[in-house]
């Protein structure tokens, strides 16, 4: 089937099903191109909750579709590739987190949204890479348990006077970016600014001109007068950066910055999902309610 025909069929079915198509910033270019909304995982789930769509087609990974289900329990949430998981989210289970909580009684758990619904359900508050510092510093407690990303946790800890207990999780894709990769590119392009995601290793973060979430990268690159940027996050972000800034050059910090799970979803998968109305991601109420509480506490913290 020709790509144009697939796109037409997707658009037709989205209309028929009263569905909204969400694509994460790391998706394949052709999936981002056809999406109704692109963004980071939480922003997408919040946007979806605000729409009057009956069906959410989430082009992302499993925990993202769970977040959409948590925030929109009355909508049908489709994840075109049920095998699109997140290795970092899988590094922590609710049972293991409860054991850690038992070792640190009365210490609040701050959980990065890149986590399963079950883990969110036994957490006190969630955070994103954009608001993690603000979330942690909003808590009155002198200590926090930070789950699951140790790299983001260390980035936050440098901007907080609290004592941190880190879960030993990480994003394998971001972890593949090495300081030597960055130094080599900075030498080759001395006029370029290096911006990276806080999921990168602290040794890489130390080299950055700016550290921010994916949504922060779009804003920074659009408003900064520099004409050349070295990008330290997953390759999918380049699609929109180049689209929005045709006069600027974007260099991926390493060819290893490709997440295999984010690249699983194809246009064919999206079409098949709409045709069959499957696979469905539905978070059970006993997990959804406490998980939503952790997300709601985060959402209630005022933005700058």
Curated annotation (Swiss-Prot):
State the pathway, as annotated in the record. Answer: Cofactor biosynthesis; NAD(+) biosynthesis; quinolinate from iminoaspartate: step 1/1
What reaction does this catalyse? iminosuccinate + dihydroxyacetone phosphate = quinolinate + phosphate + 2 H2O + H(+)
Cofactor: binding details: Binds 1 [4Fe-4S] cluster per subunit.
Listed as disulfide-bonded, the cysteine pairs are none
Source domain of life is: Bacteria
The record ties this protein, via HAMAP family, to: NadA_type2
Instruction: Give the protein's biological function.
Output: Catalyzes the condensation of iminoaspartate with dihydroxyacetone phosphate to form quinolinate.
NCBIfam families listed in its UniProt record: nadA (TIGR00550), PRK09375.1-2 (NF006878), PRK09375.1-4 (NF006879)
State what protein this is by name: Quinolinate synthase
């Amino acid at each position: 089937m020709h790509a144009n025909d697939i796109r037409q069929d997707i658009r037709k079915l989205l209309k028929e099903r009263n569905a909204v198509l969400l694509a994460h910033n790391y998706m394949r270019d052709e999936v981002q191109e056809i999406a109704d909304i692109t963004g980071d995982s939480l922003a997408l789930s919040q946007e979806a909750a605000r729409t009057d769509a009956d069906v959410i087609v989430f082009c992302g990974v499993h925990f993202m579709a769970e977040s959409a289900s948590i925030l929109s329990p009355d909508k049908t949430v489709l994840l075109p590739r049920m095998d699109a998981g997140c290795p970092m989210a899988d590094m922590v289970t609710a049972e293991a987190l409860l054991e850690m909580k038992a070792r640190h009684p009365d210490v609040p758990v701050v959980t990065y949204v890149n986590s399963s619904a079950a883990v969110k359900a036994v957490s006190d508050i969630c955070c994103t890479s954009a608001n993690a510092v603000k979330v942690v510093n909003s808590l009155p407690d002198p200590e926090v348990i930070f789950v699951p990303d140790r790299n983001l946790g260390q980035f936050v800890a440098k901007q907080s006077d609290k004592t941190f207990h880190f879960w030993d999780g990480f994003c394998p894709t971001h972890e593949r970016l090495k300081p030597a990769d960055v130094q080599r590119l900075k030498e080759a392009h001395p006029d370029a600014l290096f911006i990276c995601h806080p999921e990168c290793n602290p040794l890489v973060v130390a080299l950055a001109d700016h550290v921010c979430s994916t949504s922060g990268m779009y804003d920074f690159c659009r408003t900064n007068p520099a004409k050349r940027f070295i990008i330290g996050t997953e390759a999918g972000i380049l699609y929109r950066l180049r689209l929005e800034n045709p006069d600027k050059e974007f260099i991926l910090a390493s060819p290893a910055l490709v997440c295999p799970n984010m690249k699983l979803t194809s246009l064919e998968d999206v079409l098949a999902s709409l045709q069959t109305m499957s696979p469905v991601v539905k978070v059970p109420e006993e997990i959804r309610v406490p998980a939503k509480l952790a997300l709601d506490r985060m959402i209630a913290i005022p933005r700058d």
